[in-house]
Amino acid sequence: MEPVKNLARLSRTLGYEFTNQELLVQALTHRSAANKHNERLEFLGDSILSIVISDALYHQFPKATEGDLSRMRATLVKGETLTLIAKEFKLGDYLFLGPGELKSGGFRRESILADAVEAIIGAVYLDANMQACETLLLSWYKVRLDEIKPGINQKDPKTILQEYLQGYKKPLPDYQVVQVDGEAHDQTFTVECRIQDLDEVVTGVGSSRRKAEQLAAAQILELINK
C-alpha cells in the first residue's frame, strides 16, 4: 500500500484536516525510513496528551484524589491504550517504514504505533494550536473518559476479561501465540485470543507475549461492550 495516496482518508478518520500535509507525513515517518522522522513530534505530542488528559480528568472528577487522578491518567496515556487508538485508526496502513522494519512487521509493532499517535498529536499542535489538539483528543478519548472511574484499581485488560467471564461462569480466554518475528533482542509476538460465544478471533501484536495478550484482551473487551 502506498501511504501518500491515502492521507486524505486518514485525515477523515482522525477527524482533522492538516493545512501543512508535510507535518502529517513526518508524523507517520519512522526513523528507519528517513532523516526527517517523527521522534521530535512524538516528544511534543506526549506532553500535550498528558496535559489535555490531566485537565479533562481534573474537571470531570472534582472530588478525586491526586492518586486516583494519576492512576486514571496513566491508564489513558499508556502505550497499550495508544496502540489500541492507532489500531482503531488503522494507522499501520499509513506508516513510512524502512525496509528492515517493513520486513519484521513494524507496522504492527505497538511501540511504533503508539509513538505515531503521539507524533500526530504534536503535528496537529504545530499545524494549528493547543485548542485544536484538545478538541481532537477529547473526541478520540470520549468513550474511554466516559468509562473510566476513580477509586478503582486500574486493572489490565486480561484481568478485566477474566473476571468478566468468571462472573458469567464461562470458560477463560484461549490465548495462542501464532507467530514470532525478529531477532531475540527485538521480537514481535502475534497472539490470537478466543472466547466462548464470540465467533470472531482477535489478534494482538506486541514486543512480548504478555503485551500481545493484553492487546488482544482489550480488543475482545471492546467487542463485548459494543
Curated annotation (Swiss-Prot):
Cell location: Cytoplasm
EC id: 3.1.26.3
Name of the protein: Ribonuclease 3
Matching HAMAP family: RNase_III
Ranges that cross the membrane: none
UniProt-annotated binding residues for Mg(2+): E42, D115, E118
Cofactor field: Mg(2+)
Its job: Digests double-stranded RNA. Involved in the processing of primary rRNA transcript to yield the immediate precursors to the large and small rRNAs (23S and 16S). Processes some mRNAs, and tRNAs when they are encoded in the rRNA operon. Processes pre-crRNA and tracrRNA of type II CRISPR loci if present in the organism.
Biological processes, Gene Ontology terms: mRNA processing; regulation of gene expression; rRNA processing; tRNA processing
Recorded family membership: Belongs to the ribonuclease III family.
Classification via NCBIfam families: RNaseIII
UniProt keywords, alphabetically: Cytoplasm, Endonuclease, Hydrolase, Magnesium, Metal-binding, mRNA processing, Nuclease, RNA-binding, rRNA processing, rRNA-binding, tRNA processing
Alphabetical list of InterPro entries matching this protein: dsRBD_dom (IPR014720), RNase_III (IPR011907), RNase_III_dom (IPR000999), RNase_III_sf (IPR036389)
One Pfam short name: dsrm
A GO term, aspect molecular function: ribonuclease III activity
Domain DRBM: 156-226
Domain (RNase III) ranges: 7-129
Lineage: Bacteria, Pseudomonadati, Pseudomonadota, Gammaproteobacteria, Alteromonadales
Alphabetical list of Gene3D superfamilies matching this protein: 3.30.160.20, Ribonuclease III domain
